[in-house]
């Protein structure tokens, strides 16, 4: 394994960490409605748990209301229960075959709590990126010890991985700033 291979592998893993962080951020509720909010909701479909997107069409009625239309009429109750039981504090209302999910306004206190949650998630993502940097540096040391690469190559590789780490940590910080702005916007 060369410096380039190690760098490429680390970059792919860092990108996956960013994607996971992005998915975690999407689950954090802001005052506005978006269909991605319900992506992780699991519905009991004849005894097996399936994502809501497999049993219903999820859309937006307006900026503060999500509409969910189950494909089978008899699934309306199960879908409504799944939305109510998810940890987002939502209160769906059924109107015929359509379930309307209004987004309650966030209190100032809840907004501050959510920004703390976002910062906590960000710290976890940064730790993951830094751990990948550490693993890469250990890999470089091993390659030097095995005399596969020179110490100059090791230093160059460590510098490149550090630049990647800085880039991804900055990207995480940028995403946090955007999410906090979104949460604090009334």
Curated annotation (Swiss-Prot):
Swiss-Prot/TrEMBL keywords: Cytoplasm, Protein biosynthesis
Localization in the cell: Cytoplasm
Pfam families, alphabetized: RRF
GO biological-process terms attached to the record: cytoplasmic translational termination
CDD domains, per database record: RRF
Keyword tRNA processing (UniProt): no
InterPro entries cross-referenced by the UniProt entry: Ribosome_recyc_fac, Ribosome_recyc_fac_dom, RRF_sf
One cellular component term from this protein's GO annotations in UniProt: cytosol
Domain of life (superkingdom): Bacteria
Primary localization class, coarse: cytoplasm
Protein family according to the UniProt entry: Belongs to the RRF family.
Function: Responsible for the release of ribosomes from messenger RNA at the termination of protein biosynthesis. May increase the efficiency of translation by recycling ribosomes from one round of translation to another.
Protein name from the UniProt record: Ribosome-recycling factor
This protein's encoding gene: frr
